[in-house]
């Protein structure tokens, strides 16, 4: 038996498809999402509707974004979901969530079992729309969830941790074994809740500067910041901000990265491209 076939659909490797089929896990995720009628619920990658059906049962209207044309067609003809669905057959990586929130007249509640092969770049795409998003619930590779929630001085702490926590409050919800999927992935999974900050705890003047600093620091994470960020900050400037130049990228808190970004935005602003 081909374990890549589920409910008559062949899982496409290039789309990173692993279909959720464990009812206890599904119920736990829907309970965590807690969808309510009248909310602007948006699912990324509904697949074979494992989450779409129980969420859709509670709603009058649900928006889904599905790249796979066969799966989008199945949803369109779904016996009870079909009339409730607004289906966008396109890539979530290029989707304009801001326009959708404007169209729906309220911030979006986004959820999904994300394809693991695009989960990190998709998170960064979504972060650029946090003004238009109320909250997000995602099934991700457990290692990615660990990176999202990691604090300084840990191996998992990296650029994704800093940027996620700059934009959102990040809360792990539950862990999910490979056996909950068809075909089973080779990794453990986990569900995470991300709630964009109503008020930024560490406001930055130019988020592009924060992105640049974290990229440069974590691309050379074994180097001290005296070396990895030496082209941006002198030892005197770092010391003046109370940041030890002998620290490495993983030792610096989100607040300190934001402090560094604001210094740079004021003293060496990026030119508009």
Curated annotation (Swiss-Prot):
Transmembrane segments: none annotated. GO terms for molecular function: 16S rRNA (adenine(1518)-N(6)/adenine(1519)-N(6))-dimethyltransferase activity; RNA binding. The keyword Cell cycle does not apply. Its main location: cytoplasm. S-adenosyl-L-methionine binds at residues 18, 20, 45, 66, 91, 113. It comes from the Bacteria. InterPro entries: KsgA/Erm (IPR001737), rRNA_Ade_diMease-like_C (IPR023165), rRNA_Ade_Mease_Trfase_CS (IPR020596), rRNA_Ade_methylase_Trfase_N (IPR020598), rRNA_adenine_dimethylase (IPR011530), SAM-dependent_MTases_sf (IPR029063). SMART domains: rADc. One of its GO terms (cellular component) is cytosol. It holds the Pfam family RrnaAD. SUPFAM superfamilies: S-adenosyl-L-methionine-dependent methyltransferases. Its EC number is 2.1.1.182. The keyword Cell inner membrane does not apply. Belongs to the class I-like SAM-binding methyltransferase superfamily. rRNA adenine N(6)-methyltransferase family. RsmA subfamily. This is Ribosomal RNA small subunit methyltransferase A. It comes from Escherichia fergusonii (strain ATCC 35469 / DSM 13698 / CCUG 18766 / IAM 14443 / JCM 21226 / LMG 7866 / NBRC 102419 / NCTC 12128 / CDC 0568-73).
């Amino acid at each position: 038996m081909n374990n890549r076939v589920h409910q008559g659909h062949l899982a496409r490797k290039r789309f990173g498809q692993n279909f959720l089929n464990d009812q206890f896990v599904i119920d736990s995720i829907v309970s965590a999402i807690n969808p309510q009628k009248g909310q602007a619920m948006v699912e990324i990658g509904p697949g074979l509707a494992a989450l779409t059906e129980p969420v859709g049962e509670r709603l009058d209207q649900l928006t889904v974004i599905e790249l796979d044309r066969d799966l989008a067609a199945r949803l369109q003809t779904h016996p009870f979901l079909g009339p409730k669905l607004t289906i966008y057959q396109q890539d979530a990586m290029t989707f304009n969530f801001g326009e959708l929130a404007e169209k729906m007249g309220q911030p979006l509640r986004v959820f999904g079992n994300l394809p693991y092969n695009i989960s990190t770049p998709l998170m960064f795409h979504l972060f650029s729309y946090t003004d238009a998003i109320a909250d997000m619930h995602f099934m991700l590779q457990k290692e990615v969830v660990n990176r999202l929630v990691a604090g300084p001085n840990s191996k998992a702490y990296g650029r994704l941790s800093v940027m996620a926590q700059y934009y959102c409050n990040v809360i792990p919800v539950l862990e999910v074994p490979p056996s909950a999927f068809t075909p089973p992935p080779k990794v453990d999974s986990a569900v995470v809740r991300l709630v964009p900050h109503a008020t930024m705890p560490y406001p930055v003047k130019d988020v592009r500067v924060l992105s640049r600093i974290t990229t440069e620091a974590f691309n050379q994470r074994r180097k001290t910041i005296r070396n990895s960020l030496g082209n941006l900050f002198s030892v005197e400037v770092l010391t003046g901000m109370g940041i030890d130049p002998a620290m490495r990228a993983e030792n610096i808190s989100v607040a300190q990265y934001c402090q560094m970004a604001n210094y740079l935005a004021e003293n060496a602003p990026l030119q508009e491209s």
